[in-house]
Amino acid sequence: MKIEELPSGSYRVRKMYKGQTYTLMFDEKPDQKDVIDYMAKKMKEANVYTKTFEYYAKDYIKSRSNVLSPSTVQTYERLINVISDDFNGLKLSNITQADVQKEINRYAEDHAPKTVRSLHGFIATVLGSYRPQLVLKTTLPQRIIKESYLPSEDDVKAILNAAKGTEDSIAFQLGVLSMRRSEICALSMDDLIGNELHIHKNLVWYKKWIVKETPKTDAGNRTIYLPDTLVQEITEKGYFFKYSPNKLLEHLNKYQDKLGIPRFRFHDLRHYFASYASTIMPEADAMALGGWKSDYVFKQVYRESMRDKRKESAEKYINNILS
């Protein structure tokens, strides 16, 4: 049995077993017993996970169907179908880092980096659940940062004014107050007590539209304060928004087109909230109102929403220096 010390300080052992050579890695120099014990462990694992990756992927989803959100279950089921037959057919115990890298390379040929990362995340999750000893170090495509149009204060006010008195008025105002589409569409009148609106559920699609009683994150379970004018409007109408999240975006797009405003996502109203709220209240309060779980995510949103202002400041600085 030959033991090689590598430049990294690790030790490598190549061991022949039943006509097949196995490469074993150790952090410290092993003795013969260490090698035998490790080989026995590997053989046991190989005998446990004898079915295919596809089998264990479906088993993972089934075993967690009561705790995963419907949208997550739907996404995972879709991802199984886009994985190649070759990879889905691999015996779980035989899957190597090279197999995963090959599958990711194949998928990355005609898919966006974000989609590729989602697929890898699912594969890694399944492998991590059944073979936690397999540590993946897959090379993934670099993220592409797209500069989408972000609404200005004038854009937001124009849309709110145009929507006054319509069935969209309440939903648009709630969007400016940081609410997500799925949260708005799940609201019922008993969520409003006085001026306080309790946000604790989402309308999500899983074969049909269903109300999910738990929020997207723990921070999503929150209470926000509504002004008297908005409370009165909600009380008089007796509802918040009658349609689906998809319809809410369609309605927003109609106003954007009518007013000559570049299209942006309904979610970008949260970005507007982040930039504005950060100027008038402590960061912790803004995060709590918007339901951001971490300051990292909040700051990412805030930095993106302030992009145009940074550009304006940079241009002003350059013009002053060079003029």
Region locations from a protein language model:
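N-terminal DNA-binding recognition helix of tyrosine site-specific recombinases/integrases
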Residues: 82, 90-105, 109-139, 179-182
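Conserved tyrosine-mediated DNA breakage-rejoining catalytic core shared by Y-recombinases
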Residues: 187-233
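A Lys/Arg-rich helix-loop hairpin that forms a DNA/phosphate-binding surface
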Residues: 45-58, 70-74, 84-105, 241-243, ...
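Short, basic (Lys/Arg/His-rich) helix/loop patches that form interaction surfaces
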Residues: 161, 236-296, 316
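Basic, Lys/Arg- and aromatic-enriched nucleic-acid-binding interface segment
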Residues: 113, 133-187
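Short, surface-exposed polybasic/aromatic micro-patch for ligand or macromolecular engagement
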Residues: 1-49, 217
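Short, aromatic/basic-rich helix-turn unit that serves as a nucleic-acid recognition element
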Residues: 18-21, 52-80, 107-112
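Catalytic-site neighborhood detector that most strongly recognizes the C-terminal catalytic loop/helix
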Residues: 150, 203, 283, 290-316
